[in-house]
Amino acid sequence: MKKVISLVLLLVLAASLGCAQAQALNNATVGSTVTFGNYEQGDGQAPIEWVVLDRQEDRALLLSKYALDAKPFHEVEDRNVTWAECTLRAWLNGDFYNSAFSDEERARIVQVTNATANAPDTQDCVFLLSLDELNAYFPDEASRTADATEYAVAQGGRVSRETGKTYWWLRTKATPEDAALMVRYDGAVNEFGDSMEADIYTVRPAVWVNVSA
């Protein structure tokens, strides 16, 4: 009997938390922080914190507040690869999407068509910001700096010894054909990027979510 009561209480608590999260999303304003999904952050699974970058009627654009993991843009050498074909996009829309979000949360995520310079348009549920989006939402370098979770650092994510800030990928390719752009620890964008196979740069996922559900 006690086990049944405990189970009921847990279900009620989970439902309450879910309602609170849904309400926070529905009331989200640009610049605010919300929680959505869960991911390993160094001490087990923890709610993912997101910064609201944009709000358009019934949907909002979220960017993870912290860099959550460290991954290469593309795992094998291929100078012709763009965001459309890279392994990082496959991981974000596959393993990450399926493990970080519940069925209810996935139902809120809006699949969008992303345009990326010098790359085919893509249909994404989870993605990285493009250089154009970075410039639109973060006009000054100081606002672009980010911390990485303990887990991301443990996976090899690079951080500055001076500031502790991380280097994080964008989905836009750099001038060399075998390189992709990333945001440096100081918020500047290295126009030459780095090798797409580099596994020291971190990942800040972005999602559009329905805020009227």
Task: Indicate residue ranges for each PLM-predicted region.
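Collagenous Gly-X-Y triple-helix signature in extracellular proteins
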Residues: Q23-A213
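Sec-dependent N-terminal signal peptides of Gram-positive bacterial secreted proteins and lipoproteins
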Residues: V4-A22
